[in-house]
């Protein structure tokens, strides 16, 4: 296919145009008074959402070069989402501000490579400062505050996530389900999560989120490698007759067997997914036995004289729901309390008997996975559109609270970044010189961008608010919901340090890449052939 090649300033300006379009669409959602965005869908009802990364993923522009700019900033948002699960809008606004200021300097003759070095050094300095400022989470009240802010100031959501964390522990699993009523409810049930995702992405049932969700599935547990699909055929035929989905958890699945499963899944013959068993050696077997107890099934192992080809339906485990993504598998089971309790007692006995610290640690891990259970939040809403929006907000809130537990909290509402701007300017003036100093100052100027946007979305003057906040000490910032200047920590307006840090690092990384671009190679738009004239109507000049 023919390519179009654009150089120098033209290339950077085209990228900038795409970045402007994406940033404007995403930035309207920022802050407590941020608005929603409606996404038109080819099939089904339109979606109304308030989540930066979801909006960014939907934007595709006609111009290939501008679309490249969109894709670059989208990457900053999705990387922040992968790392921290929230803060995607902040990352987008920061990257946009850095790119705008940086391009002005490059156009004025600054060396892009040296600017990038300055940006990277400034980013490293700020990351260390954010870590210093972070305060560890003290109680469930702080968890509720983080959840509330992340869910768009929804206190009910914040409180529910704090309750869920109380019940399943800070390391526990919180899963989301679509509820049947108008109310959002919390339920704690047996279940576990382990760090293995699907073997093939073709098993995903939701291609937008790249997740496989199986409702009321059968679970086949085996500690052997599945090499031939013939071994599976008898059990697959039995399951196909029931019409229920199947999850296979095995040591591994060879290519031939995997290909057969994928083909059956794509043709709709059988809704199946496969996951590698977690752990190694004896520990893997023990974890598979834990899963068998949890799901009321049997581990098919040759040690017990069981073979795959002789497996019956009653040997398989069952669960209420299983969610699998590329990295993790979450099993939500129910109705097995007695068996799970007995298994937990057995693990505790083993812990008492062993002298090895390593073994004790691993047994403790297994116990926590099995006994902790899963908190299921059933999302309630009046309409499907509201349900989808609420689900995205809840997901952000859960991710934000987990990030806060990991790395602590900092004052929210763009306050932390705005307060760091003067500190960065001082450090850069004493430690850097020339164009590196200009690069660091580009970052310093961009740090107030999220705060300004939050203020503007609330109807205030962004530049005035930013100057006022920079002049204040400690954790004082602008509460956009009330329009007052308050102590953000005392008012419960907090952000997870991990979210702020990830957003900043990804924005600086993308900005550096855009500034150092000197040439773009993109596909030429395809010329569409004119449609042939209608039968018997000739190709005249008239519109019939």
Curated annotation (Swiss-Prot):
Residues reported in the UniProt entry to bind ATP: 29-32, 86-90, 413, 479-481, 495
Compartments where found: Cytoplasm
Gene Ontology annotations of biological process type: protein refolding
The keyword Isomerase is annotated on this UniProt entry: yes
Reaction(s) this enzyme catalyzes, per UniProt: ATP + H2O + a folded polypeptide = ADP + phosphate + an unfolded polypeptide
Gene Ontology CC, one term: cytoplasm
GO molecular function annotations of the record: ATP binding; ATP-dependent protein folding chaperone; isomerase activity; unfolded protein binding
Main location: cytoplasm
Superkingdom field: Bacteria
Claim: Plastid is one of the keywords in the record: no
Pfam families to which the protein is assigned, alphabetical: Cpn60_TCP1 (PF00118)
E.C. numbers: 5.6.1.7
Family in the record: Belongs to the chaperonin (HSP60) family.
Task performed by this protein: Together with its co-chaperonin GroES, plays an essential role in assisting protein folding. The GroEL-GroES system forms a nano-cage that allows encapsulation of the non-native substrate proteins and provides a physical environment optimized to promote and accelerate protein folding.
PANTHER family: 60 KDA HEAT SHOCK PROTEIN, MITOCHONDRIAL (PTHR45633)
Subunit: Forms a cylinder of 14 subunits composed of two heptameric rings stacked back-to-back. Interacts with the co-chaperonin GroES.
HAMAP family attached to this UniProt entry: CH60 (MF_00600)
UniProt-recorded name of the protein: Chaperonin GroEL 2
Gene this chain is encoded by: groEL2
């Amino acid at each position: 296919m023919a390519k179009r090649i654009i150089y120098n300033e033209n290339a950077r300006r085209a990228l900038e145009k795409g970045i402007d379009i994406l940033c404007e669409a995403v930035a309207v959602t920022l802050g407590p008074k941020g608005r929603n965005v409606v996404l038109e869908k080819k099939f089904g009802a339109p979606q109304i959402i308030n989540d930066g990364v979801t909006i960014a993923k939907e934007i595709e522009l006609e111009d290939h070069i501008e679309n490249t700019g969109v894709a670059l900033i989208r990457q900053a948002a999705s990387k922040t989402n992968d790392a921290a699960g929230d803060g995607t809008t902040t990352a987008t606004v920061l990257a946009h501000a850095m790119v705008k200021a940086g391009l002005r300097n490059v156009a004025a003759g600054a060396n892009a490579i040296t600017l990038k070095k300055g940006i990277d050094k400034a980013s490293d300095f700020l990351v260390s400062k954010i870590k210093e400022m972070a305060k560890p989470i003290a109680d469930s009240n702080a968890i509720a505050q983080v959840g509330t802010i992340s869910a768009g100031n929804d206190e009910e959501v914040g409180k529910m996530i704090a309750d869920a964390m109380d019940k399943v522990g800070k390391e526990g699993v919180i899963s989301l389900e679509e509820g049947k009523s108008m109310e959002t409810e919390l339920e704690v049930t047996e279940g576990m999560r382990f760090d293995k995702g699907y073997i093939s992405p073709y098993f995903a049932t939701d291609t937008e989120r790249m997740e496989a969700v199986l409702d009321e599935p059968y679970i086949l547990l085996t500690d052997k490698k599945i090499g031939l699909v013939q071994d599976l055929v008898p059990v697959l035929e039995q399951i196909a007759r029931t019409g229920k989905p199947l999850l296979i958890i095995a040591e591994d699945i060879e290519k031939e067997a995997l290909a057969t499963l994928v083909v059956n899944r794509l043709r709709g013959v059988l809704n199946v997914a496969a996951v590698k068993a977690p752990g190694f050696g004896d520990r893997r077997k023990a974890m598979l036995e834990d899963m068998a107890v949890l799901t009321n099934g049997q581990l098919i192992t040759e040690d017990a004289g069981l073979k795959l080809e002789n497996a019956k339906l009653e040997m398989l485990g069952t669960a209420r729901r299983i969610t699998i993504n590329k990295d993790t598998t979450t099993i939500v089971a129910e109705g097995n309390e007695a068996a799970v309790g007995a298994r937990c007692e057995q693990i505790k006995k083993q812990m008492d008997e062993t002298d090895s610290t390593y073994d004790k640690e691993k047994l403790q891990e297994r116990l926590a996975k099995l006994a902790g259970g899963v908190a299921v939040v059933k999302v309630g809403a009046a309409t499907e559109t509201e349900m989808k929006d609420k689900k995205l907000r809840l997901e952000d809130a859960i991710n934000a609270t987990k990030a806060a537990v990991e790395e602590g909290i900092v004052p929210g509402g763009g306050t932390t970044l705005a307060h760091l701007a003067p500190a960065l300017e001082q450090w850069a003036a004493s430690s850097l010189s020339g164009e590196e100093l200009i690069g660091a100052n580009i970052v310093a100027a961009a740090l107030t961008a999220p705060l300004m946007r939050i203020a503007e979305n609330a109807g205030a003057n962004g530049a005035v608010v930013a100057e006022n906040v920079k002049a204040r000490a400690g954790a004082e910032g602008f509460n956009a919901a009330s329009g007052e200047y308050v102590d953000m920590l005392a008012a419960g307006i907090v952000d997870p340090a991990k979210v702020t840090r990830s957003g900043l690092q990804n924005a600086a990384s993308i900005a550096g890449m855009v500034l150092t671009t000197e040439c773009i190679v993109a596909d030429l738009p395809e010329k569409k052939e004119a449609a042939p004239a209608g039968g018997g109507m000739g190709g005249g000049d008239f519109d019939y």
